[in-house]
Amino acid sequence: MRRRAGDVLFVLGAAVLAAAFIRGAQTAADDAAAGQASARILTQFYADMERTADEASDGAADEAADALPAPPAAAASQAAPECIGALVIPAIALALPVLADWSDGNLELAPCRQFGAPETDDLVIAGHNYRSQFSRLGELCAGDALTLTDREGRSRTYTVAETATVAPDDVAAVQSAAYPLVLYTCTPGAKARVAVFCNYA
């Protein structure tokens, strides 16, 4: 009887370890895919921004050029999610696109604007706790600099005012914060959220 109970416990333990291994492997694969997607979107964002700047400096476009079809890069960017800017955080060696619309699918690719806008000084950006996204937000300290560059090439520089842990259901803590920029992500296990509140530099 004891041997049978031991065998059952052994099998259960092995099943739990296997499930943890599979979950860890899936998370690592999701993280890698998100990192690759973010890199592609960021590269496209900078290419689009440069193209827009070139077009603006060239003045009015030639009518014959307007009749030509869009180059392949422009056509590809139409299929990608809309990107409102590039977020650079030197203190944690991070450069990421910020997608315009929050959704579960978009969050798998890159951090997303969840509420507000840079122009209204109430931007809230949510990102996954992937190594390729916001897993290191909790390492930021007061005074660390962040830069958000929009599609027109305008940069806004912020500094971290404070970092806090908030309850996972406390939406008001990030949405109603009196800061022009808030970044947040889940803690491991999604039991809480790490929120970084930023002022203009």
Placement of each model-derived feature along the sequence:
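Solvent-exposed, non-transmembrane regions of membrane-associated and secreted proteins
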Residues: R3-A201
